[in-house]
Swiss-Prot record:
One Gene Ontology term from the biological process aspect of the record: arginine catabolic process to glutamate
Provenance organism: Shewanella baltica (strain OS223)
Keyword terms: Arginine metabolism, Hydrolase
Name assigned to this protein: N-succinylarginine dihydrolase
A Pfam family matched in the record: AstB
Lineage: Bacteria, Pseudomonadati, Pseudomonadota, Gammaproteobacteria, Alteromonadales
InterPro entries in the record: AstB_sf, SuccinylArg_d-Hdrlase_AstB
Name of the top EC class for this enzyme: hydrolase
Amino acid sequence: MKHFEANFDGLVGPTHNYAGLSFGNVASLSNAALVSNPKAAAKQGLQKAKALADMGMVQGMLAPQERPDLYTLRRIGFSGSDANVLKQAAKEAPMLLNACCSASSMWTANAATVSPSADTRDGKLHFTPANLVDKLHRSIEPLTTGRILTATFSDPHYFHHHSHLPEHNSFGDEGAANHTRLCNEYGHAGVELFVYGQEATNPNAPKPQKYPARQTLEASMAVARLHQLEEDNCVFIQQNPDVIDQGVFHNDVIAVGNQNVLFYHEQAFLNTQHKIDEIKRKLDTELYFIEVPTAKVAINDAVKSYLFNTQIITLPSGEMVIVAPTDCQENPAVFAYLNELLTLNTPIKQVLYFDVKQSMQNGGGPACLRLRVAMNEMEVAAVNQHTLMNDALFSRLNLWVDKHYRDRLTTQDLADPQLIIESRTALDELTQIMKLGSVYQFQR
């Protein structure tokens, strides 16, 4: 049977804006109040997804969240008509309105943690939506995320969906952005790497001092239990607190893995060699640990360019390719390193550059925009086929974006009642295009 690693990219929502909501994310904060272009953002994401599909990759799309989130605004005391709720919130609590209008669900690396059937005791693919409790604007996502994932991976014979973890900082969970999987072949049992920022229940354990550690060891271990993983299939690694304090808010900003390759910065982890030895003990295959030294790429350059927030994909030919943002080309140190990497004795043979600047300016590169799902051909056949990228879906979604999206949006525009109508009309049509059913609150 054939096996694949599919990428499910987040479709950028109609309210994509730069509100600077993500403390600890340097790009998000430094670009606050820029004028955004939701139409361009959505099209940049679609272009990247279509390019991967054209390379022979299994490529899907995940629908965005409903925004503005009037349900949350009403829960916190704003009332009256929809227009009045927006008007009140804009006047009395503009930052809360901004949080309820974020299009951050585009970064589906934070949507969930996924364990393939080759690793789990029950032989099913497991999904746990991330609770994202560290950030208000993301903490309102998990329920709808769960509905969208269930509508996309709907066959219970193959897919096991869990609820998100308890909504408490002890179980802070940021999903696949802090998780990667190493294996020989996608269909073989592998080792899942769970990267955490702190131990919530151990006050003496190392933790960052400036920025929050969004992922806890307790959350990572809970997900591993839910997914029915054996101890021999898991390695729990602490991210270096010092790099979190330099803007590395998720592990996918400082490391990325694919099959038998782990590509990471030398400052990425604590006790690096000890953990590499553990991976080698648990995974009996030839492994490539590509460590990027600070002398060649400083942490600041890695964060600005998102060198590690790249995708490493294996093409049908077996060749590994890095999918990088054009920002990596524009940074001399990073571009020089990537060119050098191609001359080294590793499976990575090519770097492809994509313009995802609308996402990058909000702090999300190519790897943020995708959720990896390793599947066999029967599982791929069981996926909602209307969510899989092909010529027809690409054309239809581009027309849909042209029809419904603005090409200019400021934070002041978020209080425009017309934006609610535009967004709901667009999402209602999208659920019909992608055959998702009533996943949104306004449809229920």
